[in-house]
Amino acid sequence: MDRETFGRETGVSRETLDGFETWRALLVETNAHTNLVGRSTLDQFWARHAMDSYQLLEHVGADVTKIADLGAGAGFPGIALALGLRDRQQAAHVTLVDSVGKKVAFLRKTIAALALDADARSVRVETLDPAEGFDLITARAFAPLNKLLGYASPLLKNRAQGLFFKGQNYRDELTEARKHWTFDCEVIPSRTSDGVILRIHEVERAN
């Protein structure tokens, strides 16, 4: 997949497509000296990173106004969501969280370059305050589901939902997580890989 194919398949505006290209160029430039993503995956930016992340947008409700992306890394899916939300004229703020300072520096540079409604925080995810009232929690390649729910459960209150990317072994992760947690889960097949997206809510510690 290339830029033009991505543009056709998503239907985003030319301005938004330019934003994705700027993000890609910043990623290539920064990744030359700072390990943000595997270098071998940069040639697959449009399919493996951009489209994979962008597919999440169709599962983001129109009432969502505050999103937290845990373990944000190079911005997948947080930056893609911020670009997509602006493209569909939805006023929503994305908070990208990562404990690695160099990654957060890249995220802040990207947010500024694209003038996104977003912020990046160099903190551990467990320090996020549930009182901030996030509507949606996202994570991609961050932690096994059992551990991820430990981080996210305080934030998944008051009808908040999680959208978590998982690989082919997601059933094993669900089985392990259900030993420790009760939750509602919808399994959504990924459009770009053999993995899935898990929509999770109503999370509580198992008795």
Swiss-Prot record:
Signal peptide: none annotated. Its EC number is 2.1.1.170. Belongs to the methyltransferase superfamily. RNA methyltransferase RsmG family. S-adenosyl-L-methionine binds at G71, F76, V125, E126, R140. It is found in: Cytoplasm. It comes from the Bacteria. It comes from Maricaulis maris (strain MCS10) (Caulobacter maris). This is Ribosomal RNA small subunit methyltransferase G. It is an enzyme of class 2 (transferase). The keyword Ubl conjugation does not apply. The keyword S-adenosyl-L-methionine applies. InterPro entries: rRNA_ssu_MeTfrase_G (IPR003682), SAM-dependent_MTases_sf (IPR029063). One of its GO terms (cellular component) is cytosol. SUPFAM superfamilies: S-adenosyl-L-methionine-dependent methyltransferases. It catalyses: guanosine(527) in 16S rRNA + S-adenosyl-L-methionine = N(7)-methylguanosine(527) in 16S rRNA + S-adenosyl-L-homocysteine. One of its GO terms (molecular function) is rRNA (guanine-N7-)-methyltransferase activity. Keywords: Cytoplasm, Methyltransferase, rRNA processing, S-adenosyl-L-methionine, Transferase. Specifically methylates the N7 position of guanine in position 527 of 16S rRNA. The lineage of its organism: Bacteria, Pseudomonadati, Pseudomonadota, Alphaproteobacteria, Maricaulales.
